[in-house]
């Protein structure tokens, strides 16, 4: 080999191109790529900066979420770089927009540690959302291959086993959040739990921010709550539960609280989304080993899931949480006070409940998904709902859901037990009408009025809340069809 600089440079350039070159040219754009069954697929909504080609922007997302950095590095030659590069293989304009694009990206399964939501997310959403060439970026959907799902535990209990444990079949579960969420003493807290369960509810729950504050420490809350559960079971003959929030500052504290809850005899514990993916997976594994139902409150999700052009769609969180091992997750109400377009909510529920998903663009489902026998997650509908909406809730959300009437139980003028009874009677009257094949949606208001003739608490609730609703336009709506975004 010649020792001249020119000759060494020529040979190097034939083998390896250095410097800053476009991501698309580096191999992160491949429109001919044949997607493998084992690939992890992601769909991003990409909003490039003015002047940035959408294909180059999509290739940049693929590169920065897999193996690339800002310049070519020679150590690529020490890896199977052609295999490990993520490939943007399809870029489509988003309907009815001028500067948004759907980028389909494939990742080889070997890029990810088996069974680790933390590692999966570190690549997919780890760094790329701050990329300057893109003014906004949103992760809309993912396909997780069966080969990867087989390394994941999935829900600790699942809805089928939960129904068997709770002895509740043929209708939604009922349960509100204790209100006010903060400030009650342990004894008063337990009284709220007892009254709600005694009145006919299946569950009560802690709220997301009740942990162990000076006005009520966690152990005090657990003791009074379980006393209430046991007394209500004795009084009604029904299986009851209370979601005990074990969220804490360390895993050691969470395990301690969960173990104490188990010793008290609870059938369900609760955690918050804000504890993080590793902590959620860890608690899912604990719950499976200890035959415990695991409820997840989605606290904090709207900071990144609500806006349409940046962040992450809630359906992706649903997929990750089904993998992580939770049994419940709040997933929207349609008619309540929180964000919820009807088609988007249906897509979330399908993601949590179906064994296989087909592509359904109006509901925001971009990929087929085989869940590989992972158990089903029960969606939770909570926030601004009341018994006067029971026909709508049953129609939109179906049987497999927890309907949580917090203010709609505890705000009843005649007390908590009356509020619980109103909700139970409203639900059972609507389920009976449905099972009789009546048009319970159209007849819903009259069905409730008829039931109220023999249930004073229901009549009082209907008189109080009437047809109150939170009629605001949703921010996260379908891209492929027009959809009613306000409550209907």
From Swiss-Prot:
Site positions for Transition state stabilizer, renumbered to this chain?
337
Q: Does the keyword Manganese apply?
A: no
The enzyme's main class, written as a single word, is lyase
Q: Which residues bind substrate?
A: 127, 177, 181, 298, 330, 382
Q: Return the EC number.
A: 4.1.1.39
Known partners and oligomeric status: Heterohexadecamer of 8 large chains and 8 small chains.
Q: Which reaction does it catalyse?
A: 2 (2R)-3-phosphoglycerate + 2 H(+) = D-ribulose 1,5-bisphosphate + CO2 + H2O; D-ribulose 1,5-bisphosphate + O2 = 2-phosphoglycolate + (2R)-3-phosphoglycerate + 2 H(+)
Q: Known Pfam families for this protein? A: RuBisCO_large (PF00016), RuBisCO_large_N (PF02788)
Q: Lyase as a keyword? A: yes
Q: State the disulfide connectivity.
A: none
Q: Extra notes?
A: The basic functional RuBisCO is composed of a large chain homodimer in a 'head-to-tail' conformation. In form I RuBisCO this homodimer is arranged in a barrel-like tetramer with the small subunits forming a tetrameric 'cap' on each end of the 'barrel'.
UniProt binding sites for Mg(2+): 205, 207-208
For this protein, the parts annotated as crossing the membrane are none
Q: Which UniProt keywords apply?
A: Calvin cycle, Carbon dioxide fixation, Chloroplast, Lyase, Magnesium, Metal-binding, Monooxygenase, Oxidoreductase, Photorespiration, Photosynthesis, Plastid
- Annotated CDD domains: RuBisCO_large_I
Molecular function terms from GO: magnesium ion binding; monooxygenase activity; ribulose-bisphosphate carboxylase activity
Q: Which HAMAP family match?
A: RuBisCO_L_type1 (MF_01338)
Task: Please give the name of this protein.
Answer: Ribulose bisphosphate carboxylase large chain
- Where is the major localization of this protein? plastid
Q: What does this protein do?
A: RuBisCO catalyzes two reactions: the carboxylation of D-ribulose 1,5-bisphosphate, the primary event in carbon dioxide fixation, as well as the oxidative fragmentation of the pentose substrate in the photorespiration process. Both reactions occur simultaneously and in competition at the same active site.
The entry's free-text remark on the cofactor is:
Binds 1 Mg(2+) ion per subunit.
Q: A GO biological process this protein is involved in? A: reductive pentose-phosphate cycle
Protein family membership: Belongs to the RuBisCO large chain family. Type I subfamily.
What does the UniProt entry say about where the protein is found? Plastid, Chloroplast
**Gene (UniProt):** rbcL
- PANTHER family named in the record: RIBULOSE BISPHOSPHATE CARBOXYLASE, RIBULOSE BISPHOSPHATE CARBOXYLASE LARGE CHAIN
